[in-house]
């Protein structure tokens, strides 16, 4: 007795209300301003009853430059050490893209870069 395969119909969701996976990447040199923007984004998403994952704290990149203090090369060999730390956070949202436009319209502090990636 072999069972015949059944055709299963999946309900079609319209493109206007389709739910996307949206990844918001925040980078900054200032940790305090970065955390403030993360908190504002997450609070706005939770007010809209969206599914939120994050903020995921990525490893801090430390850029270092070591250079001689004297331009002519004479004298004792003294060195200057400069460094810049870049902090990164990732927030994942599951929502329609129209709602994300409302959420990302918050005041973003200077020095914080925002990158929004939409995937299906």
UniProtKB/Swiss-Prot annotation:
Expressed ubiquitously in embryos, highest expression is in the midgut. The keyword Ribonucleoprotein applies. It holds the Pfam family Ribosomal_S10. The keyword Ribosomal protein applies. Belongs to the universal ribosomal protein uS10 family. The gene is RpS20. Keywords: Phosphoprotein, Ribonucleoprotein, Ribosomal protein. The modification Phosphoserine is found at residues 16, 18. GO terms for molecular function: RNA binding; structural constituent of ribosome. It comes from Drosophila melanogaster (Fruit fly). One of its GO terms (cellular component) is small ribosomal subunit. One of its GO terms (biological process) is translation. HAMAP family: Ribosomal_uS10 (MF_00508). This is Small ribosomal subunit protein uS10.
